[in-house]
Each structure stands twice: as structure tokens, then as C-alpha cells.
Amino acid sequence: MRENVLKINKVFQHYFLTQKILPILTIEELDSCNYLSDIFLENGIKVFEITLRTKVALEAINVMSKNKNFIVGVGTLMTDHNIQNAINVGAKFGISPGISEELFEGCEKNNFPLIPGVSTPTEIMVSYSRGYKVLKFFPATVLGGIEMLKALEGPFPDCCFFPTGGINQNNFKTYLSLSNVYGVAGSWMVPKDLIDQKNWKKIREII
């Protein structure tokens, strides 16, 4: 299984070679998918995450993953059941808020790429011991943000992070300047309230 995970690390290197910001979408209505698809295509955004926080989340993944320009990830991934459902609707990778044996085993048996969520050195060590080197650092700003990531670089030189939680237009460039930050993830580019309001003009302005 570890060899499969090591190969998966290379998958993420390919996904995020040129795109260092991962938009996080929370979609309540399916018709939003078409508008968001247009906006992403206009702005060269190919990789993004749809969270499993709404009733239509899996349908939204299914709709947007049918566009061959997109690599759609599933967020808020927590159980083996989540994994199976996500794979069935076309998700190409998963991102979790934390770690568990069920999550690791479910992703590994299905060769499903995972960015596990970590918040402590212990969780980093557990993930690294299974071969995971690309990790979600969550919730980033609450855990110390920039300074915490700098502190983690020494003991974990082989790990790289996707800080998530509190990342915004004012601080994302500072995070990206860190050598152990692979990319940043956040909803500031596509705020849920603007999606719910269908304020596509404002979202275009932000992006």
C-alpha cells in the first residue's frame, strides 16, 4: 500500500504544477455548476474541491467532473462510504479535515489520491509513516499559521503542506512564499454566500 501512496504524491505534483491555489466550493443548487464552470474556464482554473457539506454535493461533483478540462476533488472526506460515493461520481482526489485508519485504508485500497488533514506533529508523523507527504494543514491560522509552518519545516523536511482555514486574498501570497507550502486552499475566491446569491459578477471580480 505504501508504494501506491508514494505514487499518489506524484499525482499531486502533476495536478498542482502550475495552479497553486485550490478553490473550495460548497454548492447548494446544481444550476450553480454551469456558471462556476464558465468562470473557472475563463480564468484557467482546472483543479478545485467540492465539499461534502450539502445534499447536492455528489451530484455537483458528477456534473463538473464531466468537463474534461477539470480535475475535481472531494472535500470533507471522512469515511469509506464517502470515498466510494466520490469515486462513483468522478472525483479524482480527496481532501479530509483529519485522519483515521478507515480513511487511510479506504483510499489506499481504491488507489484514491488523498491529501490528509493534519493539525499536530503527531498527525503529520502518522500520515508520513504511511507515505503521505502532501498534507492539508488545517485550520491553518488558528494553529499559528505562518510561524507554525516555519517551525514544522525543520523536523519534517520531506513534507509539504496545503494550508487551509483563514487563508484569504491578503495572506495567501505570504503562505505561498514558504518553502514547505505546496499550495493554498480556501473559499475566498468563491464564497458560499456569493454562490448562494448567484452573484457571478462579484465572483468574477474576486478571481
Located regions from the model:
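Glycine-rich beta-to-alpha transition loops that act as phosphate-gripper elements at the mouths
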Residues: 26-29, 74-80, 96-99, 116-121, ...
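Catalytic cores of alpha/beta
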Residues: 36, 79-89, 122-130, 147, ...
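Glycine-enriched alpha-helix->loop->beta-strand junction motifs that scaffold or abut catalytic
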Residues: 41-46, 67-70, 87-94, 108-115, ...
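Active-site phosphate/pyrophosphate- and oxyanion-stabilizing loops and adjacent acidic/basic residues
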Residues: 62, 150, 173
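Glycine-rich phosphate-binding active-site loops on the catalytic face of alpha/beta enzymes
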Residues: 93, 97-103, 136-146, 180-202
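Histidine/lysine/aspartate-rich catalytic loop segments that bind and position anionic ligands
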Residues: 102-133, 138-143
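Hydrophobic secondary-structure block in the mid-to-C-terminal portion of proteins
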Residues: 154-207
